[in-house]
């Protein structure tokens, strides 16, 4: 049975789905990391694939940009297709003073300027956090691969272009490591519908210092993050 946004059949998705924002990255991962990968959905060019990694079934599907896009795909994957584990993989902007471009970051929790999680619990702040087991498996996979990673709080925003850049300095004082646009929504959906979720990123640029990863170097650091995610399942 398909949904308005996913034209797959029940059983087409593995219990674990990796979710990059860009559907073309989903295609890249399927073609370069999975065995026997097949495309299972393509509505609005939001591509999804299922294959195996070291014999384990795994799916890859794009999430699009922002909490609304991530939330509708995550909900449909969980409710209609029986997905149990959702792992966001993507880039982020560094905030922390000790965060460098190319760093790998695990989002232990995600604060946000969106009201989406408040709406879930009648205006009450909801602590959007990663599933502990997925997080632990990810951190251990990074260690086994010899990849240093940071673990901590991130900030999920609805506004890509902030009017006041000093805002990020306030977040740095609170120990927030990085900014993205999806994680708080993903964690909220997973909590609401009884699934597990975790997000990890590579730092593509730093929103305070202005430092950025050259475009030709981004793929190699992205590959490291994908490897961590796949080894963690």
Curated annotation (Swiss-Prot):
<feature type="site" description="Important for catalytic activity">
    <location>
        <position position="218"/>
    </location>
</feature>
<dbReference type="GO" id="GO:0004731">
    <property type="term" value="F:purine-nucleoside phosphorylase activity"/>
</dbReference>
<dbReference type="GO" id="GO:0006152">
    <property type="term" value="P:purine nucleoside catabolic process"/>
</dbReference>
<feature type="binding site" description="in other chain">
    <location>
        <begin position="204"/>
        <end position="205"/>
    </location>
    <ligand>
        <name>a purine D-ribonucleoside</name>
    </ligand>
</feature>
<keyword id="KW-0328">Glycosyltransferase</keyword>
<feature type="active site" description="Proton donor">
    <location>
        <position position="205"/>
    </location>
</feature>
<feature type="binding site" description="in other chain">
    <location>
        <position position="21"/>
    </location>
    <ligand>
        <name>phosphate</name>
    </ligand>
</feature>
<protein>
    <recommendedName>
        <fullName>Purine nucleoside phosphorylase DeoD-type</fullName>
        <ecNumber>2.4.2.1</ecNumber>
    </recommendedName>
</protein>
<comment type="subunit">
    <text>Homohexamer; trimer of homodimers.</text>
</comment>
<comment type="similarity">
    <text>Belongs to the PNP/UDP phosphorylase family.</text>
</comment>
<feature type="binding site">
    <location>
        <position position="44"/>
    </location>
    <ligand>
        <name>phosphate</name>
    </ligand>
</feature>
<dbReference type="Pfam" id="PF01048">
    <property type="entry name" value="PNP_UDP_1"/>
</dbReference>
<feature type="binding site" description="in other chain">
    <location>
        <begin position="180"/>
        <end position="182"/>
    </location>
    <ligand>
        <name>a purine D-ribonucleoside</name>
    </ligand>
</feature>
<dbReference type="InterPro" id="IPR004402">
    <property type="entry name" value="DeoD-type"/>
</dbReference>
<feature type="binding site" description="in other chain">
    <location>
        <begin position="88"/>
        <end position="91"/>
    </location>
    <ligand>
        <name>phosphate</name>
    </ligand>
</feature>
<feature type="binding site" description="in other chain">
    <location>
        <position position="25"/>
    </location>
    <ligand>
        <name>phosphate</name>
    </ligand>
</feature>
<feature type="binding site">
    <location>
        <position position="5"/>
    </location>
    <ligand>
        <name>a purine D-ribonucleoside</name>
    </ligand>
</feature>
<keyword id="KW-0808">Transferase</keyword>
<dbReference type="InterPro" id="IPR035994">
    <property type="entry name" value="Nucleoside_phosphorylase_sf"/>
</dbReference>
<comment type="function">
    <text>Catalyzes the reversible phosphorolytic breakdown of the N-glycosidic bond in the beta-(deoxy)ribonucleoside molecules, with the formation of the corresponding free purine bases and pentose-1-phosphate.</text>
</comment>
<dbReference type="GO" id="GO:0005829">
    <property type="term" value="C:cytosol"/>
</dbReference>
<dbReference type="InterPro" id="IPR018016">
    <property type="entry name" value="Nucleoside_phosphorylase_CS"/>
</dbReference>
<dbReference type="InterPro" id="IPR000845">
    <property type="entry name" value="Nucleoside_phosphorylase_d"/>
</dbReference>
């Amino acid at each position: 049975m398909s949904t308005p946004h996913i034209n797959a059949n029940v059983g087409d998705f593995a219990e674990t789905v990796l979710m990059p924002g860009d559907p073309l990255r989903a295609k890249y991962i399927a073609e370069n990391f999975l065995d026997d990968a097949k495309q299972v959905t393509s509505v609005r060019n939001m591509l999804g694939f299922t294959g195996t990694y070291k014999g384990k079934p795994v799916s890859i599907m794009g999430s699009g940009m922002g909490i609304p896009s991530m939330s509708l795909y995550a909900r449909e994957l969980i409710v209609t297709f029986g997905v149990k584990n959702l792992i966001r993989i993507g880039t982020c902007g560094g905030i922390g003073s000790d965060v460098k471009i190319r760093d790998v970051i695990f989002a232990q929790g995600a604060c946000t300027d969106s009201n989406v999680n408040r709406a879930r619990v009648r205006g009450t702040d909801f602590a959007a956090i990663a599933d502990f087991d997925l997080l632990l498996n990810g951190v251990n996979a990074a260690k086994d691969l010899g990849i240093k990673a940071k673990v901590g709080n991130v900030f999920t925003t609805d506004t890509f272009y902030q009017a006041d850049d000093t805002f990020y300095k306030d977040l740095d004082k609170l120990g927030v490591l990085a900014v993205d646009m999806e994680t708080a929504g993903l964690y909220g959906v997973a909590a609401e519908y009884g699934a597990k979720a975790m997000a990890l990123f590579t730092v593509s640029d730093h929103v305070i210092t202005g430092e950025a990863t050259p475009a030709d170097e981004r793929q190699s650091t992205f590959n490291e993050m994908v490897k961590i995610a796949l080894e963690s399942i």
